[in-house]
Amino acid sequence: MMTDLVSATSQSLARDPMVGLRLARVDGFEPAVALGTDELPAYLRRFTMLFADDATMRRGGIGRVTRAVNAQGEAVALKQLILPTRDEFDDDAAHEALVTKFKAAFREEYECHRALSGLKGFPRLYGWGEVGGVPAIVMEWVEGETLARLRSRFAVDDAGRLSPLVAARLGRDLFDLLCRMSLVGEGFVHRDISPANIM
């Protein structure tokens, strides 16, 4: 009897893609693109109530990215700022100054991404808001592996070196991507080109 209940529950969980997801409400959502007044309500509904899968969370420099789905089942990436904790500081002023600095850097990252959104090779940006009082960016979810995770599969020796052909192809594709950045108005400098940020 108990075995049947466990089996039925397991089957139910396997079929329900929403099980194990955390509700992430994006407050103060600002769309990344200009929208007409008739388009705004649907856009807000699309990106302000998300279901985040914390099992997919990956941490970067000052943020963490989690795969989330909206009510329509569309996958998006929810990137949240990682704020410094209070216990790392002796005084409140130093802590608050660092929090302000982190928030400004995260907003600058959003604005830079906004300039590149829509260019081939860059994830589409949907908007900015806060989740639980923490700044957040909603963008296109890109399925795949980072170069940092894949490079061992492409290695030709124990030192992790790539074959000249693979290295040349990666270099060519990265160069092509960097050239597209010149299409942005006054130019653009990417400050975090690394294998962890290349998919």
Language-model region placement:
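Protein kinase glycine-rich loop
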Residues: 54-60, 65
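Catalytic-loop of the protein kinase fold
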Residues: 182-199
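Conserved short submotifs of the Hanks-type protein kinase catalytic core
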Residues: 132-146
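Activation-segment/catalytic-loop signature of the eukaryotic protein kinase fold
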Residues: 128
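Juxta-kinase regulatory segment immediately upstream of eukaryotic protein kinase catalytic domains
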Residues: 2-48, 52
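Activation segment signature within eukaryotic-like protein kinase domains
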Residues: 170-171
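AlphaC helix of the protein kinase catalytic domain
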Residues: 147-161
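AlphaC helix of the eukaryotic protein kinase fold
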Residues: 93-115
